[in-house]
Amino acid sequence: MIRIVARQVIKKDCIEKYQGLVKELVEKSRKEDGCLSYTSNQSLSDERVHCFIEDWQDQAAIDAHNATEHFQRIIPQFATLFDDKEQVELYRQII
């Protein structure tokens, strides 16, 4: 299992647009083969800070996800909504 944690800081005036795009991305991604969990989360201390926490069966599932129509269409739209560069980290479960 591979976990992806992708953190974004959204421009204050773009939060609503971001959340609309995220809704579609999450709904479609959850239906993909190899997707174990896919959530979008918002910080309790700063409404502009969001993160995806994604659990995938393996790298092949991630590669397939990254090639989907919805990923290819939605992800580029995020770039104009961010206040800062997205931070993405991959994890493996140890316990």
What are these model-derived regions, one by one?
Residues 66-72:
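Long, charge-enriched, surface-exposed interaction segments in small proteins/subunits
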Residues 1-2, 95:
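Absolute protein N-terminus
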